[in-house]
Amino acid sequence: MSTYVSSVFSLATMKQNPLKRKRNDEITEEKVVLLMAMHKEDDEHQHTKPSPPSWEILCLVGPYMDPESLAVASCVSTTWSKCFSSEDLWKSLPATRHSIFAKAITKEGAKPAWLSYKRLISEAESAAKRRRNNQPAEPKISLSDLVFIVHVSAGSKEAVVVKQGKDLVFGSNERFQIEADVRDSGFTADMKDVSMSWNVVLRNYERMFLMSETVIKSLDSMIGWFTDELPGTKNRYCDGSNLVGEVKPSFNEDVLDKVVFAIADSRNWKSLFVDDVLRYLQCFLVD
């Protein structure tokens, strides 16, 4: 019998037999009901709130939490308070976060009996936070945003020196100063009533600030000068009411070679660092 004849015979036989076998993947009414029940059960699980963790688990988590999280967790409930206020738990924190206090409290009688480790760590964390909050913010401007203009005149002699901030290089612990080369202007040590001014300009001359303008009664190769107080600011990190312009002359024999300008604090007569100068200047150059 050929393959074609066999196929036709089999098809005819199936048509004559109404009780054919069901396929395993055939969707019956029973399967539909079962699928609906399973979907409903899954949906109920998705909308059911998870049960809170056991208090034993909470105690295991405690040693891995930071002091701030522990303090917040201890206020959630009575059970949480017992877990996260344990003296043994808080006692381990000084050694890892505040080594100075850890060394102090190990000494006999250093910690009063009434003082809990939780209170001790809370005070230490608060002190550290206050310290961080009192740190000055980064300046909004940089030296590359600024141009410094120094003007020196006496009688018919005059010198104008322009310094681009981008060309100035300072070390991390170096104090700010501007050096103006006036060697070719003919200023001599015996000159009287020498006028000096120091201007700062924001990029592309968007804003200008007259830092200092003064008249030096007599050039003297032995000493420097201080200008009047600089304009005050409301910047708590750099109080302009205590700042003065500092001028240091440099002579080559009797000829004025260079003039160095800086900003000094009149309380200790020390020049300011670069970032402090930028914080001061931004009060006048940036809205």
UniProtKB/Swiss-Prot annotation:
Pfam families referenced in this protein's UniProt entry, alphabetically: F-box
Alphabetized Gene3D superfamilies for the sequence: 1.20.1280.50
InterPro entries for this protein: F-box-like_dom_sf, F-box_dom
Protein name listed in UniProt: Probable F-box protein At5g04010
Cysteines paired by S-S bonds: none
Lineage: superkingdom: Eukaryota
Domain F-box: 50-101
